[in-house]
């Protein structure tokens, strides 16, 4: 729209020059155009929350040349359009602070260029009203602006006398009844230098940030970088949160993957803890202890994801617009400590399992297993405490969890020791592979069977080591390219300044597929542990024993109940028999006594006879 407007102005100027050949324009004056309906109005004022030209206008904003323009079938004031243009100009100047001098003067000049002071013809040359005419910026002012900031020459051409006359502008008002000076009405150009010199020491450069960047005061402790704000030097503009490396759809895919896979892995890890740590009473081995502790540590990692998604992932990572979470945010500090403890403890036990496996295969007598437990726990606690004490737990930009982001801390307290541990694990795995190869020659069937039993723990350690190796490579690849990523932010800003939006402009970051796989590997360990150990024969036997013991216990209780019932029945039956026997005995005795009595009576009777 602005280009069309400039073209029309150029066309009108050509017509005026051709038609006005008989008029003699003064040297040093530009040719002006009179727009019917133009008015001298007060400055409409700055937008709320965004200072622009208040206190920077030549005449204090009392009279500004104003017209009405038709845009999308709506009449819009030229002042409103100028506010849009001046905001874009200020946004560009904000990012030129380290390349230009005296930008404050440039802002004064741009304000007068876009909000031209307005003069009215005196006396009235029309019956009803004065003719309103703009005062243009002097050429010397334009040249000073371009001299201080050569980049402005790409947008401003000081040789255009229509905009930047040396002395003033002449307007042909013959159509309006003006006859003096052959109908040419002279309006002097303006030079804000004197006004600028009087108040410049009381003014500051106005900074403006293109959307979606946000403007913050970096000198205010509330908005300092250690609070989670990422500033774009030399400005006070901060990047959005999360980092605009990817589209909103791509970020959503990462969030959905993490949410789904973390939930599944957490359940799988809890299953392993329940199986090998709680229900297992008869198979207390070093392997099972390693499985339990690895599952516990990795469950802690996935618990942080459950907390995040319950809290709201975007609210968790970005508590405020433009600010990423830091350790002072309670949720970030707690989950960061849990994440570091869990991931470090898992690495320690992966190394421990590989050592135990190697020693078992090589028949090497291992020192007390509890030494591993003490060492792994102390190391993990110490590194976690150091990071918390240094307040290094942050969400950062372009990540989906709170953890340590400072290069030397994360290398010293995580990647270096864990890299050494994984190297030991890989060495032990190599020894196991070599031993399996030797045993596979059928030297001893019994020993071969023993070695083959170690395939699952070997697979687990190999998978964990391989996954961590990818994470290791990805991390250092990102660190290697971090400077190029930072340099590419300039292209992102240029895209925004050129009229781009958050849907079309992006910063440069790690390849999206690699980024997605990085977080996939971190969240797949729980499923991996379950697929190797949770479905093993040992796990099935543990559950079978638990179920069998429960069934046997219930059967035993049932049999005991039946036995007690039978005992009661037998006692009752015995009592009845005794009663019957007693009665029979009594009846027999009575019968005998009766018979004896009869016999006795008979004998008596016989004796009597």
Swiss-Prot record:
Residues 21-259, 310-337, 387-408, 479-511 are extracellular. GO terms for cellular component: membrane. Keywords: Disulfide bond, Glycoprotein, Membrane, Receptor, Signal, Transmembrane, Transmembrane helix. Residues 1-20 form the signal peptide. Glycans are attached at residues 75, 130, 172, 198, 217, 245. Residues 559-570 have a biased composition (Polar residues). The chain crosses the membrane at residues 260-280, 289-309, 338-358, 366-386, 409-429, 458-478, 512-532. InterPro entries: GPCR_Fz/Smo-like. Residues 281-288, 359-365, 430-457, 533-609 are cytoplasmic. It is a multi-pass membrane protein. Residues 575-598 have a biased composition (Low complexity). It is found in: Membrane. Disulfide bonds join 40-118, 53-111, 100-149, 138-189. Residues 599-609 have a biased composition (Basic and acidic residues). Residues 35-192 form the FZ domain. Residues 559-609 are annotated as: Disordered. Belongs to the G-protein coupled receptor Fz/Smo family. PANTHER family: FRIZZLED AND SMOOTHENED-LIKE PROTEIN B-RELATED, G-PROTEIN-COUPLED RECEPTOR GPCR FAMILY PROTEIN. This is Frizzled and smoothened-like protein E. It comes from Dictyostelium discoideum (Social amoeba). The gene is fslE.
């Amino acid at each position: 729209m602005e280009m069309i407007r400039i073209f029309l102005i150029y066309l009108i100027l050509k017509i005026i020059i051709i038609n006005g050949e008989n008029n003699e324009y003064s040297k040093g004056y530009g040719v002006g155009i009179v727009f019917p309906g133009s008015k001298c109005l007060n400055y409409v004022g700055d937008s709320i929350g965004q200072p622009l030209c208040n206190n920077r206008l030549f005449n204090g904003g009392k009279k500004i040349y104003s017209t009405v323009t038709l845009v999308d079938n709506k009449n819009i004031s030229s002042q409103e359009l100028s506010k849009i243009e001046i905001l874009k100009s200020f946004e560009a100047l904000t990012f030129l602070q380290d390349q230009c001098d005296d930008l404050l003067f440039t802002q004064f000049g741009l304000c007068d260029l876009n909000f031209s002071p307005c003069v009215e013809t005196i006396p009235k040359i029309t019956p009803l009203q004065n003719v309103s005419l703009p005062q243009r910026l002097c050429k010397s002012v334009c040249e000073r602006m371009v001299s201080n900031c050569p980049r402005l020459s790409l947008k401003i051409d000081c040789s255009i006398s229509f905009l930047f006359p040396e002395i003033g502008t002449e307007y042909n008002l013959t159509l309006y009844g003006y006859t003096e000076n052959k109908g040419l009405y002279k309006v002097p150009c303006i030079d804000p230098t004197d006004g600028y010199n009087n108040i410049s020491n009381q003014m500051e450069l106005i900074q403006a940030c293109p959307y979606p960047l946000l403007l913050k005061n970096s000198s205010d402790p509330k908005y300092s970088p250690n609070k989670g704000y990422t500033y774009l030097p030399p400005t006070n503009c901060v990047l959005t949160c999360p980092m605009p490396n990817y589209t909103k759809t791509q970020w959503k895919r990462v969030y959905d993957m993490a949410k789904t896979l973390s939930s599944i892995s957490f359940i799988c890890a809890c299953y392993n803890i329940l199986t090998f740590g709680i229900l297992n009473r008869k198979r207390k081995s070093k392997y099972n202890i390693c499985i339990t502790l690895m599952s516990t540590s990795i469950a802690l990692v996935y618990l942080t994801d459950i907390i995040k998604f319950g809290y709201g992932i975007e609210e968790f990572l970005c508590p405020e617009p433009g600010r990423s979470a830091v350790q002072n945010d309670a949720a970030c500090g707690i989950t960061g400590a849990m994440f570091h403890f869990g991931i470090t403890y898992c690495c320690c036990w992966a190394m421990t399992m590989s050592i135990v496996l190697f020693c078992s295969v090589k028949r090497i007598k291992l020192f007390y297993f509890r030494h591993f437990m003490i060492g792994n726990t102390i190391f993990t606690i110490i590194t976690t405490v150091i990071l918390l004490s240094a307040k290094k737990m942050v969400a950062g930009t372009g990540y989906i969890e709170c953890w340590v982001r400072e290069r030397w801390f994360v290398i010293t307290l995580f990647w270096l020791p864990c890299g050494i541990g994984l190297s030991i694990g890989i060495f032990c795995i190599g020894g196991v592979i070599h031993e399996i190869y030797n045993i596979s020659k059928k030297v001893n069937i019994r020993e071969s069977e023993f070695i083959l039993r170690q395939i699952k723990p070997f697979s687990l350690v190999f998978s964990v080591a391989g996954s961590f190796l990818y994470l290791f490579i990805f991390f250092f690849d990102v660190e290697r390219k971090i400077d190029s990523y930072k340099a590419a932010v300039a292209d992102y800003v240029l895209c925004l300044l050129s009229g781009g939006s958050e849907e079309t402009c992006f910063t440069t970051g790690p390849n999206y597929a690699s980024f997605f796989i990085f977080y996939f590997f971190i969240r797949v360990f729980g499923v991996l542990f379950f697929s190797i150990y949770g479905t093993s024969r040992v796990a099935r036997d543990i559950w079978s024993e638990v179920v069998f013991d429960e069934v046997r216990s219930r059967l035993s209780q049932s049999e005991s109940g039946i036995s007690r019932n039978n005992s009661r029945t037998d006692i009752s039956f015995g009592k009845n028999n005794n009663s019957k026997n007693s009665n029979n005995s009594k009846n027999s005795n009575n019968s005998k006594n009766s018979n004896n009595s009869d016999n006795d009576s008979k004998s008596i009777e016989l004796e009597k006879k």
